[in-house]
A protein has these predicted regions:
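ATP/NTP-dependent adenylation/nucleotidyl-transfer catalytic domains that generate, transfer
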Residues: 1-54, 58-165
């Protein structure tokens, strides 16, 4: 696709933050995992600000519906060209574009830790989630999980609460 990439190694920054946090709290696995997406967000915005650019979002309708994103991490962006597409639709689009098989066949992963995949972490397949989003129908156990995840993550999609006293 000839897209320019640059790499910033945030490993030492993450390690330093985790070390600093030891003096104030004991980090849960979820809190620890969400540091990386938030560091990526601050890095993307720093580069964008320095170069007069905007940050592109990579989240999709499937992830947004169940809240499978880090608030103020990978959920932060200035624009998002794929926000209204499900994972299924994104893969269809990639096939249409002629994307390499290694991209299409790779299991979706937020990269939160080694060996992590979205579906294993969610306990839900994108096929079931997307069927629900596109048709309103899916396996009953999957539907129950989808509805619970959607309700539990409403705070991620809602506007910031403000005091109007």
């Amino acid at each position: 696709f000839r897209i320019e990439t640059r790499t910033v190694d945030l490993t030492p920054v993450r390690a330093a933050e985790l070390e600093a946090l030891k003096s104030v709290t004991e980090m849960t696995d979820a809190a620890r995992a969400n540091i990386a997406p938030r560091l990526r967000m601050t890095t993307l915005y720093a580069v964008a600000a320095a170069e007069g650019r905007l940050v592109a979002g990579t989240g999709n309708r499937s992830e947004a519906y169940v809240g499978y994103f880090t608030k103020w991490g990978d959920g932060a962006h200035d624009f998002n060209p794929i926000a209204d597409l499900t994972v299924t639709e994104i893969y269809e689009f990639l096939r249409f574009l002629g994307a390499p098989a290694c991209v299409i066949e790779k299991a979706p992963s937020a990269g939160l830790f080694d060996g992590q995949t979205d579906e294993s972490e969610m306990g839900l397949s994108y096929a079931d989630l997307d069927a629900f989003l596109l048709t309103g129908k899916t396996d009953s156990a999957a539907e129950e999980k989808i509805r619970k995840m959607h309700a539990a993550s409403e705070h991620k999609r809602a506007p910031i609460a403000t005091y109007r006293g």
